[in-house]
Design a protein with these regions (language model features):
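N-terminal active-site segment of His-dependent metallophosphoesterases
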Residues: 1-55, 63-76, 80, 144-147, ...
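Beta-strand-turn-beta hairpins that frame and shape the catalytic cleft
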Residues: 2-11, 75-84, 125-131, 154-162
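Active-site neighborhood of phospho(di)ester-bond hydrolases with catalytic His/Asp-centered motifs
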Residues: 12-14, 33-39, 56-61, 84-87, ...
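Residue-level detector of flexible, active-site-proximal loop/helix-junction positions
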Residues: 17, 62, 138, 156, ...
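Short active-site segment of divalent metal-dependent hydrolases/proteases
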Residues: 18, 42, 90, 120, ...
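Conserved beta-sheet core of the metallophosphoesterase superfamily
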Residues: 56, 93-162
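Helix-adjacent hinge/juxtasegments
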Residues: 56-99, 103-104, 109
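Short, solvent-exposed aromatic-acidic interface loops
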Residues: 161-173
Length: 174
């Protein structure tokens, strides 16, 4: 588990599907970095997020055109946290195990692995690595669930995650 003498906040979002509620921008205000795990579907979403903090984004299965040309997986580091992001967890883990992600060796262990795709918020610790799916920021998997995003915070005790519910799309009410 990564421990940092400093403090960093990372906004994590996925599956916006062309909708970015203003509350997301409020929740991400002051973060050091934003990770978008795919299915962006609208370039203005990334523009709005980039106005808040640097953004690492990957293509999802619904992204086309310019967004479809985003990488499928990305490795990076922010605030001492080594992360890998990809849209589909199964594909990401296969490519990670095979050493096929640029900048990541076969035996490297990231601190944080972020995926999206299934629209279900989830957090799991495996051998000191935090696996995180922030859920969908626009279209939750189950009808009675709320859209969600996540905030990852680093500090002297390691990584912590907080899920944040955001409003449903107006066209998804009811």
């Amino acid at each position: 588990m990564v421990k940092s003498s400093g403090h960093a906040r990372i906004g994590v979002i996925s599956d916006t599907h062309g909708h970015l509620d203003p509350q997301v921008l409020e929740e991400f205000a002051g973060v050091d970095h934003i990770i978008h795990a795919g299915d962006v579907m609208d370039g203005t979403t990334l523009e709005a997020l980039t106005a808040i903090a640097p953004v690492t984004a990957v293509a999802g299965n619904m992204d086309e055109g310019k967004l479809g040309k985003l990488p499928r997986e990305v490795a990076g580091k922010v605030g001492g946290v080594r992360f890998i992001v990809g849209h589909k967890r199964k594909r990401l883990l296969k490519r990670l195990a095979a050493g096929k992600i640029d900048g990541v060796g076969r035996h490297d262990s990231p601190d944080l692995v972020v995926c999206g795709h299934d629209h279900l918020p989830a957090v799991e610790w495996v051998d000191g690595t935090l696996f995180l799916n922030p859920g969908s920021a626009s279209a939750p998997h189950y009808e009675d669930d709320d859209p969600t995003i996540a905030i990852v915070e680093t500090g002297p005790v390691g990584l912590g995650v907080r899920f944040v519910r955001v409003p449903r799309r107006a066209d998804d009410e009811g």
